[in-house]
């Protein structure tokens, strides 16, 4: 792509020193926290094979850690890019690296949305709990997530270009292409998944507050975890997608108007907002530690598996199975009473009465 649409001002993502410095700091912090954190999650869950089947939530968290860890492995490359102000891998590397970033972004947000939907079903439809442990279901869902992410990430590679052999950034053939691409990315990678997360967690919290086992300490613990996940997701991704929308609006605005000039400012701010989105890949392991911190003294390094063994899905499913057992064993208790009636002539009438009452 030889001719690229550029907003007024000829700004690039390396133009603002403050954005470069902020981006570098966020990338370093993300790598410091996220690489060992996600590595620990993968180590803890990959080899866990409970006899009842791995909970779907644990499988989704495992793949979420894989997606986050993959993009965090690229942080040294981006730190070098921002600090040296030159892209080191050429045109092919420019497209390939940003494709991996987009793939990880879509996989992460889709897995987060699917995880919130799973938690909602585990609370509102407890009879589905055994089915949610099905390995076949997990394989189908994960295949769909990764295939969707592979397809949705394609524009990130198509619209990346190495400018002047030193800046790897977006290159659209026209303003219409820029507006369409950036708007679609925000819709599919933020608006729809974030709306799903908010809706599912809203339903889950409403159900937990009204349920007997949702009150007290456990209800507070679940509520804090839900609030932290939603807050982190929204805060860390919102600036990136705000820049997307700003540039999309600027691309369609009159070239000499104030909105068009804001597109250049958004381009210059992209380094910092992209690095902040990178930081979202390191947050989830920290949230798991805060959620299951009381399990550390008892479970040690395997506290994460203990967390999912005692998750809401397991408890609700257990309660559902216990309720089924009560219904099945009640007639047997009546039969025991009937057996005593054979030795007692008066027992037969009571046996028939009890059976009819049940």
Curated annotation (Swiss-Prot):
Residues 315-358 are annotated as: Disordered. GO terms for cellular component: membrane; nucleoplasm; plasma membrane. GO terms for molecular function: G protein-coupled peptide receptor activity; leukotriene B4 receptor activity. Pfam families: 7tm_1. Residues 1-24, 82-96, 162-185, 247-275 are extracellular. It is found in: Cell membrane. GO terms for biological process: keratinocyte migration; neuropeptide signaling pathway; signal transduction. It is a multi-pass membrane protein. The chain crosses the membrane at residues 25-45, 61-81, 97-117, 141-161, 186-206, 226-246, 276-296. Belongs to the G-protein coupled receptor 1 family. This is Leukotriene B4 receptor 2. The gene is Ltb4r2.
